[in-house]
A protein has these predicted regions:
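Alpha-helical transmembrane segments and their helix-helix packing motifs
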Residues: 1-330
Length: 330
């Protein structure tokens, strides 16, 4: 159930990234922002789905659009949507007795929603929209239909852990883009993280790096914020610890989560970046920005490894990722 949750969340984030990237590359937003596509493709490179290139160049963006289709639909592309949906179906079949009929059926119906490899961009966008709607429906069924036993808790732990990792991957794009001489599209990051309207209501201002960090890292009332995921992880691990017959079984995990929470709450987002004053300037990202994200990422990975050793002793401590760049953040 833990890995079912992780792969479900991983596939949802990839589908959202692909949807916004294809939309921006083919139609463009209502208010054009030149760095939208470059930002999204850079994040896909950071997460290992694409090679590192100059994604500001229009010809490279056009070439990469074909690569995005492969990530979405090709059965030969490792760690693309086809691969993830195939794994979800296999896991759902193995866990059939722990899932409701409707939940199991939604898991099995994700794979047929993928478009043909030679589909045009409009068909691809329509299919990605349908996939994300089904994933949202699946999340709703899991939330409303599953009893709060250990199966649900491990599924929830897997999802919250993976969402936390994906949030850090998105935010790493800000630092990466600044290092490469252009500003990351903050509107695009908010849209990909499903927080665009939340930001508008909360701040009623043009997106800035400090405020985006405040919303996506420090806001414990935002279900898409990192600290929200960590608090949910702690809540579920605390229940498992109380119900465990082995004293101290989850004590290490709780210590790691407490350290992450303290680190986030002690963060002063206003000192992590200096907003550009003109459109031609690049945002100045302080070294503490990457130090914070890398430190949080290492702590989440430490939590994952510790939980694996505590509960899945048959599993080796392995880290798999997409083919390009070995899935490493650079």
């Amino acid at each position: 159930m833990f890995w079912l949750g992780r792969n479900l969340e991983r596939s949802e984030q990839l589908a959202r990234l692909l949807r916004v990237a294809v939309e921006r590359a083919t139609e463009g937003p209502e208010i054009p922002e030149p760095n939208d596509v470059a930002t999204l493709m850079s994040i896909l490179a950071l997460t290992g789905h694409l090679p590192f290139k100059n994604y500001q160049a229009p010809d490279i963006q056009k070439e990469t659009l074909e690569e995005l289709k492969k990530i979405a639909a090709s059965p030969d592309y490792g760690f693309g949507l086809y691969f993830l949906f195939s794994r979800l179906k296999e896991m759902a079949d193995l866990l059939h007795d722990r899932l409701s009929m409707d939940t199991w059926e939604l898991f099995t119906r994700l794979l047929p929603l993928l478009p043909e490899q030679n589909a045009n961009c409009q068909i691809l966008l329509n299919r990605l929209n349908g996939i994300i709607l089904r994933q949202n429906a699946l999340s709703g069924l899991i939330r409303e239909d599953m009893t709060r036993d250990h199966s649900w808790r491990f599924l929830e732990i897997g999802r919250r852990l993976e969402r936390g990792m994906q949030i850090l991957n998105l935010l790493s794009g800000i630092d990466f883009c600044a290092d490469n001489g252009f500003n990351a599209s903050l509107e695009t990051l908010l849209e990909t993280s499903d927080s665009r309207m939340t930001y508008r209501v909360r701040y009623m201002a043009v997106p800035t790096v400090p405020l985006v960090l405040d919303l996506l890292v420090c806001d414990d009332g935002n279900p898409r914020a990192l600290i929200y995921q960590v608090l949910k992880l702690r809540q579920n691990i605390s229940v498992l610890e109380k119900e465990s017959r082995l004293p101290g079984l989850f004590s290490k995990e709780l210590l790691i989560l407490d350290e992450i929470i303290d680190r986030i709450r002690a963060t002063d987002v206003m000192n992590l970046a200096e907003q550009a004053r003109t459109l031609n300037e690049t945002v100045i990202v302080n070294p503490a920005f990457s130090t914070l994200l890398n430190g949080l990422r290492l702590k989440l990975q430490e939590f994952s490894d510790t939980l694996t050793l505590s509960c899945f002793v048959h599993a080796a401590s392995t880290r798999q990722g997409p083919a390009y760049n070995k899935g490493k953040i650079k």
